[in-house]
Amino acid sequence: WDITNFVWWVGIGHAGTLISAILLLFRQGWRTGVNRAAEAMTIFAVICAGQFPIWHMGRVWMAFFVMPYPNTRGPLWVNFNSPLLWDVFAISTYFTVSLLFWYSGLLPDMATLRDRAKKKWAKMFYGVAAFGWTGSTKHWQRHESLSLVLAGLSTPLVLSVHTIVSFDFATSVIPGWHTTIFPPY
């Protein structure tokens, strides 16, 4: 059930990314009402999905030994042929891009919170979180171009992550699950 749940949560994350990124790339004005929820849905779904490859290993407390670490027996590296390792790479990349896409949309809001904060520590916290956002035309132009780049990056990333996740089934030795149509499917 763990790999099935992994695929389900990745699919939920893909839905959030595609809703937000495709609507941004097609310049849909009504996107602003749903983009924050779709991007947050992606982040929380990817966090949930990221746990299932660890649970799939069977012994969660042994997850440490999957990572390469220095030892006295020479360098030990992970098995790059394992689809679970590629799941980790795919989910890590997908999570990073989704987090950047989500947080770049929060920058103007962080600046608003900074400007409305009454306490000094809150002003300082939101000032750091806003990365010096002032709302100038230059900042809005850069924000728009960054959002377009991240949306353009995350849309094909959805397809690549989906392909890597489907390799879990395409490369398995379970009868009935081995087929070459899974990665593009």
Each language-model region and where it sits:
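N-terminal regions that are enriched for targeting/export leaders
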Residues: 1-12, 76
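Hydrophobic alpha-helical transmembrane segments of multi-pass membrane proteins
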Residues: 5-9, 54, 86, 96
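Central hydrophobic cores of alpha-helical transmembrane segments in multi-pass inner-membrane proteins
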Residues: 9-25, 47, 98-101
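Flexible loop linkers connecting adjacent transmembrane helices
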Residues: 24-39, 62-74
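Membrane-interfacial loop-to-transmembrane alpha-helix junctions, especially the N-terminal start
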Residues: 33-40, 149-155
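Hydrophobic alpha-helical membrane-insertion segments
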Residues: 42-56
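Transmembrane alpha-helix boundary signature
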Residues: 53-65
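Long, contiguous internal "core" modules enriched in hydrophobic/ aromatic residues
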Residues: 75, 80-185
